[in-house]
Amino acid sequence: MAQVQQVPSSPMNGIPEKNGNGLSIEESASTAVAALAHIQNGAVLFHGTPTKDLNGASTSIDTDDLQLSPSDLRRRSTRASALKAQEKIKLKDDIVQGPQKRANDDDDMEDEELGDEINEQSAPKKRRLENGKEFDQTCFRFGLRANNEGEVYAMTDESENSSIHESEMEVVRYHYEKMKNKEPDEEQLRERLNMRREAENQLREEEAKLLVLRKMKDSQTRAITKLAAETKAADLAEATSAAYKPAVATNGKSVTNGKNSMIESNNKTMNGLKNLSIPQQLELLQKLSSQSPAAKQAYIMAKKNPAQTTQLFQQLITINNQNLQKQKELSAAETNASASASPAVQQSQQAQQPQQAQITQSKLLNQQTPAQRIQAARLAFRAQADKQLTTIPTQKSQPHDITFLPNPNASAFLALHGLDLVVQHVLKDRSNETPYAGPSYECEECKTECAHTWKAIGSTQDDLHLYCENCVRSAQKRKNRTDQTALLKRAFQKITAQEKLLQEFEKKIAEGQLEQYAEAKAAAPATSQTIPTSSTATVSSIPLVPRLPQIPSSTGSSTPTQAVKTSTPIHSTPKSSSSSAKKTAAQLQQQSMQGMNQLFSTAMLRNNPQMQQMLQMYQALAMGGGAANMANNQMAMLFQAQAMQAAQAQVARAQAAKAQAAQAQAAQAQAQAQANREANQQSMLIQALMSNGQVNVQALQQLQKLTPEQQKALIEVVKRQTRK
């Protein structure tokens, strides 16, 4: 048996080799000694192949150390071959990956060294903000923004805030939120107010420009419309030539003038047509062809022979003028016929008009149901009530409680609170101030002694009552409230009376008496116009006495009488005797005589001969005819009443003129007296100011009563005298 020598395993690059079971080569070799094969010729064999060490030298093994059976050697040799194959694979991987791993290790070491150097010497950062607590959002470098989650970040690298570290970002976020929620200071508010005012001024200017443009457009439109209307009227006047006069008022000159005007208009038209070309004349004829058959015939002929267009136009104008003349003659004949109609026909037509209106009204009333009539009456009442309420004037503005000093340019600046007295009291030099030695003022209403303004109210200078400003204003307010309340009460009373009438009207409608009421109203004027022809004739329900309600009596105790209106017509009854007629005629004659006497005396005083003559004629007619003639002669009564009314109107006008003249004279005298008083007061004030330079309380009160214009004039006079 040959001896087997154990071969020690050499490390590869200092790393011991391991087999697949995780054991090193030495351990596997010690356990696999029994697996070695037989050694022939003094060499170790693995499956009959001699082995070498890692350096290529042959290995000699002492065969005396170990003797194994063939089965053990076979088993051990198989395991050893597997281990040897694994060793070869590892050796190959070590040869390929060894230099790369060493290079990677060297790079890692160099990177670590460079990182240490960079940490020791870091690159310079970007320029930071001078003050991190303030940001200018208007600057383009302000790149901080906040997202929906509230996180603040830098938008671009150009932002000055991009160099801020993460540790400083919390401070930046805090100041940014504080700046966003910060309230504006006074300067910012002032700037915003100025910007707002500038924007409002610009808006007003734009609105003013727009308004001016609208007005200009409207004026241009009106001018164009007016020019078009004037042009149309001028064309119409030229077309219809001169105005037509009826045959009754015409003479030879007017006829010749009309013919001359027609000739002139024809010449103008022909001159205008000469300026047009033949195609334009044909186009004009085509437009006129739809108006008359003659123009259509002329257009057809001109289309066949365009050279005769001007002559056809002249013929067409002549035919048109002849037609116009015929129409004027026909209208004049109709006017003359209507003017020559009898006045009786016109009077009958005028008399039929009220009857037709009454018939139409009755038909309308018959067509409506009672409910519709009541509804219409209520609507009319409501419309009338609304109209009355809208006519009520508004309440007068209440006087304001002034607790401040108004504008110095206002008229009530000095007279309101006595500002001049306050200034004199505050000044250091009190030489101009004169103390008031009299008793203190006291209000007659509230008995107060302290008021900033006093009011002296009275009809004359000797009858003046002193009141404070508060009492005067409260009295004015009470008066305004009382007047408004009285006005509303009167309106309410009117509406209440109308409501009562409406209720009565509705009651009549419900009872079916509306037709009778309407017939009574319609029969009232007809019965008033009936004239009795004899003493046995019926007496009208409404006599003629109301026609003379305004005739005054000599004693002045007469009152006008009014006709009594009833819902149903009162039928006249025949008289049993003429005593009542005689009494009525006597009373009527007495009243008329009294009125005539008064008017006659007035005419005598006024020296009006025409009025005297007319009244004498009417008086003689009345006295000569007697009572029966006065009752029968209604026309004379009517003339007499008209004459009396005219005389009364003349007397009233004369009295009004006299009263107006007296008022004007009194006003002139009062104005002259007021001017004299003001002149005297001004002279006294000037003397007081120029004498000692001191002003007493009365002078100050007079100065306060002056208007600003009077005060300015007084100051100018004082300045002029001081200069002299």
From Swiss-Prot:
Residues 105-119 have a biased composition (Acidic residues). GO terms for biological process: chromatin organization; mitochondrial unfolded protein response; negative regulation of transcription by RNA polymerase II; positive regulation of transcription by RNA polymerase II. Residues 85-95 have a biased composition (Basic and acidic residues). GO terms for molecular function: DNA binding; DNA-binding transcription factor activity, RNA polymerase II-specific. It is found in: Nucleus. GO terms for cellular component: nucleus; NuRD complex. Expressed at low levels in excretory cell, pharynx, vulva, and posterior neurons in adults. Strongly expressed in the excretory cell and more weakly in the pharynx in larva. Embryonic expression in the excretory cell. Residues 1-12, 56-70, 527-541, 551-564 have a biased composition (Polar residues). Residues 186-216 form a coiled coil. Residues 332-358, 565-590 have a biased composition (Low complexity). Keywords: Activator, Coiled coil, DNA-binding, Nucleus, Transcription, Transcription regulation. Residues 1-23, 55-129, 328-361, 523-590 are annotated as: Disordered. The keyword Isomerase does not apply. Transcription factor which binds to the 5'-CCATACATTA-3' motif found in the promoter region of pgp-12 and activates its expression in the excretory cell. This is Transcription factor dcp-66.
